[in-house]
Structure formats: structure tokens, C-alpha cells
Amino acid sequence: LSAQQTIPYLSMHPDGVCKLPGGLYTKTVEYEDINYSVASTEDQTAIFSGWSSFLNYFDSSLPFQLSFINRRSHSRSRYQVNIPKADDNYNSVRDEFTGMLKNQIAKSNNGIERSKYITFGIPAEGIAEARPRLERVEADVMGNFKRLGVPSEPMDGRARLALLHSQMHPGSREAFRFSWKDIPQTGLGTKDFIAPDSLDFRQSRTFRIGQYWGAVSYLQIMASELSDKLLAEILELDAEMTVTMHIQTVDQLKAIKTIKGKISDIGKMKVEEQRKAVRSGYDPDILPPDLITFSKDAAELLADLQSRNERMFLLTFTVVNLAPTRQRLENDVFTVGGIAQKYNCALRRLDWQQEQGF
């Protein structure tokens, strides 16, 4: 199996449409941060409401994923500081001030560049059918971001390939050199321009990509409510990683039917517990605490779906850690696991599924 075969897409088009196995076509939009944590309570409520409406836009036929990428920046910083020199006696001061600004920028993010993306996909028979539908979704997504006050930018094919190249070459200072004219001239495919020198998935809990070590984990959510601080704390770490939230909306009728079925099952369990209590001479109104909690949570969820126009989502939360040494990798994974544990979640390694997770 070659490194190119590990990269799962089938084709990338110049306009940013990517074809995946199973007839799924995707596009990606890069977006920036919004000052949520430092906003007032009223503003936080408004932002949260807007974000909820944004997520509710996606129906069951439109899977999407949120990607948060922390990568180590090198000499080519995305923040360019340049104070032009003048014909006077103050150029040494300008040089000193420029150096100070560059140092402050490096310290503020610990040399880590943090990027955020949303990728959405639709099933289609071909690119001609997929392209106009994806363009409509892209316009809606960017319109929703604009209403939230979040700057966003669609990614074309070269930008998506450059992003994949940076993911496939951690720690490398090599620039991404690619032009669509290179394809017919060289006979190479787009994967040949982004594939790493080597990928090694022979170990069960780690993998090698070039000279770097990597590990893929997933988040086991055991909390009844997931704190908005969990993701923020993970992304603030001084570590190279990719956090991905794969989200699939459940059809509304199916979701309501599923919850009603669960409530019916809980009702049967209540009756059975009450029968046991009567036979044993206990008060039948005293039920196990877990059963009471499950019943209350299910009723609240059904109310959200039926009367508050909320949606049910299936979520897969994965974390890909990358590090130059195995010890640093294990330390980074341990730190992420500690943050997850603080919010009543567990970080589980994908044993023998590192390639699929990556």
C-alpha cells in the first residue's frame, strides 16, 4: 500500500470540489475566531443562539465536519511584520522594534498557528450535479457566518491541497509547489504533490509520518452536558494536533420516533421495578436514581425536538496528535486526556485503527 493510497479522496478540482468514495462531493470554508469567551453574558447568549441556528441549517442529507488545526509555524509566518527603512539615523530603532514585534507574536501563540475549517458534503451522481448544489450550500454557510460576525473564506482546490500538504509534512520547511498545469505536463496526480515520504501504521496505538510520530484518539462523552470550554482548552495547548468533529444530523421524524421508543422502554423498566418493589414489600414509588435521571433527560430531549425546533446530531470527536518524538507525543496525548477527564469525558486511543482515524 502506497502513501498515496492512504489518502482517501478520489479527485480534487480547481474550484475546491473534492470527490470521495461513495459518490460524496465536498467543499471547505475557512473561518476565523469570534470573541466568545470575553463577551458579556448577553452577547454570549446571542452568539450561542446564532451558532445553534447555524448548526440547525444542516439537515440529514448534508453531513459536515468542523476541523481545528494547530500546526507549528516556521520562518514563513502568516503574520508579516515589515517596517520599511528610511534615509535617516533611526533604522537601528526600526530593526529593534520589528524584532520585538516578531518576538511578541511568537510568544503570544507559542509558535502555533491555529486554523478552523468547516467541510460539508452531498451525495451526487457526478460533478455536474454536485457543483451547483455545493455552491448554494457554500453561499448559505458563508451568509450564516456573516450574520455571526465571523470572517470566512471559501477554499479552492489548490488551497485545500496546500492544507493537506502541511498536514502530511509536519515539521517540514518545504514549500508547497503545485500548479494545475503540472498535472498534464508531469503525468502525476494531485496526491503525488502532497503525499509524505512515508507512512507507517504497523503499530497498534501510534503511527509514523515522515520523521514524526502520531496518534489518533476519540472522545468518549459521558457528561450529560458538554462544556463549551472543553474544545477551547484543548486548542490552547502548545502542541501540534488536529481536532475534528464529524457531525451527521438525524432526520427529525426518526429522532422523535427514537426518543419516544426510549421513553416507552424506560416506562416498561419503571413498571418492572415497581412490581419488584411490591413483591419485596418496598414502596413502589421509590425508583433507582438512574432510572429517574434517564426518564427526565429523555422527556427534555423530546421537548427540545418537538417544541423548540432543535435537532439531534450524531457526533464523532477525534484528536490527531503529532510530535517529533514518541515521548513528546505520549505527553501531549496525556495532557489532552487530562482536559477531557476534567469535563467528565474520556480520551480513548483507536487501537489498530490509526490509519482509518488519520
Q: What annotation goes with each model-predicted range?
A:
Residues 1-358:
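Extended, folded cores of ATP/NTP-driven motor/assembly subunits in large transport
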